[in-house]
Structure formats: structure tokens, C-alpha cells
From Swiss-Prot:
O2 binds at H60. PROSITE patterns: GLOBIN (PS01033). This is Myoglobin. The keyword Protease does not apply. Nitrite binds at H60. Coiled coil: none annotated. One of its GO terms (cellular component) is sarcoplasm. Gene3D superfamilies: 6.10.140.2100, 6.10.140.2110. GO terms for molecular function: heme binding; metal ion binding; nitrite reductase activity; oxygen binding; oxygen carrier activity; peroxidase activity. Belongs to the globin family. InterPro entries: Globin, Globin-like_sf, Myoglobin. It is found in: Cytoplasm, Sarcoplasm.
Length: 147
């Protein structure tokens, strides 16, 4: 619970501009881990130089961060939020669990740079994301998805 609170203390700047922060997260994810861009068919042909100004990347990044905000505010009571998300990511999008770990690292970097998330906050975010990812993975296993 304390980890969720610590991350939420720094969530305000992210929440104030989901589109900008979401674009930063996805652009960095695609730049640092180019293989992840292939998991998003609608972004597959976008050149690195064009990502920062791409409205679709901003919109999807905003969706990702809004969902993370819901999960943070649930403070661990997130089964009802995770189940449908895990279902769509396993059955429709086929997103391997490793990619949640990659985007978590990127979110930590962006929050450090743009929202002042310090070392203790980064550790708290890592703890929170480890819990969330474990719960997503448990749902994946129930669905028989080994991605």
C-alpha cells in the first residue's frame, strides 16, 4: 500500500497531460526496444523521427497511462481492472508478458524525468509493477496464454 501511495504522489504531472507523457513512453519504448513496435500493427510503419508528433501514438500512450492510473488508485485491489485487460492482451493483441516489464522500465524513466520520481519512488514503482505484472501473468496462465 505504501508503494502505491509513493507513486501516486508523483502521478499528478502524468495525469495532467496523459497524451504528452503517453507519447514519451511509447516513443521511448519503440526506440529502446524496437521489437516492441511490431506488436502494434498501426504503428509498424512510423519512422522514429515521426513518433513524437504522431497523434495515434499519443492517444494510445494516453490510454496506457490512464489504465495505469486506475491500477495505481486501486492500490492493489485491481482484479476487476486487470482481468479484462489481461484477456484482451492475451487473446486479441498477443502481448508477451516481457513487454509489460519493458514498458514499466520506460514509465519509470519518464516519471523520473518529467514527474520528479526519485530513487525511492522508482523502487516503489518497480514493486507496484511487479505485483501488477504477476497478476496479469496469472490471468494469462488461466487463459492458457504463454506469451
Amino acid at each position: 500500500m505504501a508503494d502505491f501511495e509513493m507513486v501516486l504522489k508523483h502521478w499528478g504531472p502524468v495525469e495532467a497531460d496523459y497524451a504528452t507523457h503517453g507519447n514519451l513512453v511509447l516513443t521511448r519504448l519503440f526506440t529502446e526496444h524496437p521489437e516492441t513496435q511490431k506488436l502494434f500493427p498501426k504503428f509498424a510503419g512510423i519512422a522514429k523521427a515521426d513518433m513524437a508528433g504522431n497523434a495515434a501514438i499519443s492517444a494510445h500512450g494516453a490510454t496506457v497511462l490512464k489504465k495505469l492510473g486506475e491500477l495505481l488508485k486501486a492500490k492493489g485491489s485491481h482484479a476487476a481492472i486487470i482481468k479484462p485487460m489481461a484477456n484482451s492482451h492475451a487473446t486479441k493483441h498477443k502481448i508477451p508478458i516481457k513487454n509489460f516489464e519493458l514498458i514499466s522500465e520506460v514509465i519509470g524513466k519518464v516519471m523520473h524525468e518529467k514527474a520528479g520520481l526519485d530513487a525511492a519512488g522508482q523502487k516503489a514503482l518497480k514493486n507496484v509493477m511487479t505485483t501488477i505484472i504477476a497478476d496479469i501473468e496469472a490471468n494469462y496462465k488461466e487463459l492458457g496464454f504463454t506469451g
